[in-house]
Amino acid sequence: MNTKYNQEIQDEIIIKRLQYLLNQVYKLLPSREEGIDWEKPLATIIEEINGMNSLFNFELQSIIYPLLCKMEGLYSLKAPEDFSSFRRTIFECLNLIGGLVKNVRIK
């Protein structure tokens, strides 16, 4: 895949990074459950996805936009009674990142 700086990055490298982000998103669940800070890791994930989007000028806005919206929305799900919504949203994010991986493989 070509960056906006005209630098070619192998698809496998991008896929590995997306899989790493997938794992980081999944780790937010036990972190929140155990009372460990999950907001800073979430901010880092959002930052990296924004950076990837900017760097690669992804043609996958139909995936990136809802992914970032859902991730940003996690910040509002802090109350104990919000955990099931938090969990559901995490799994929706995981599915969207999986969609990014599939699209990179197709190209």
Regions found by a protein language model. Name each.
Residues 1-39, 90-99:
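Short terminal alpha-helical segments
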Residues 5-16, 36, 55-65, 80, ...:
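Short, solvent-exposed segments of well-ordered alpha helices
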Residues 23-70:
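Amphipathic alpha-helical interaction modules
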Residues 68-107:
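Amphipathic alpha-helical binding modules
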